């Protein structure tokens, strides 16, 4: 059997039941689409990273137990209709933070990071993010 990854993008297979199977290009981003940034001054400081995917290293300031902080990410790769997904990366205590992108606009997004542990944390947690293009064109 052929490796499905060998099927070229846009290749269609018709079946006897009139169903079509289409091969799509690989999902993901190459190195050129990846960016990194380190937050300066505090956990609420705005960061600038112009990339479709990447890692944000937060400032190591203290974040009290069950407390949230918001910060803006300026990013020219984001359109107003895009979806930004985020999760805690490998930096910081595993499972200690709840991470969400709570707002998206043209060239900007807002992240909320919550310390979900029973104690204060002072570490440079990392956030991995990806921008999903949802434009109709």
Each PLM stretch: what is its role?
Residues 82-92:
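Terminal beta-strand-rich extracellular "head" domains
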Residues 2-78, 104-137:
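Extracellular receptor-binding modules and their adjoining Ser/Thr/Gly/Asp/Asn-rich linkers
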Residues 45, 92-104:
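Surface patches in mature domains of proteins
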């Amino acid at each position: 059997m052929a490796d499905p990854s060998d099927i070229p993008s846009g290749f269609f297979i018709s079946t006897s039941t009139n169903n079509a199977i289409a091969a799509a290009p690989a999902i993901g981003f190459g190195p050129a689409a990846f960016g990194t940034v380190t937050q300066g001054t505090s956990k609420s400081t705005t960061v600038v990273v112009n990339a479709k995917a990447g890692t944000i290293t937060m400032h190591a300031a203290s974040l009290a137990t069950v407390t949230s902080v918001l910060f803006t990410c300026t990013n020219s790769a984001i359109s107003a209709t895009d979806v930004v997904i985020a999760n805690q990366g490998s930096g910081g205590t595993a499972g200690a933070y709840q991470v969400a992108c709570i707002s998206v606009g043209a060239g900007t997004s807002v992240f909320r990071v919550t310390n979900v542990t029973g104690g204060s944390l002072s570490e440079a947690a990392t956030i991995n993010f990806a921008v999903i293009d949802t434009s109709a064109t």
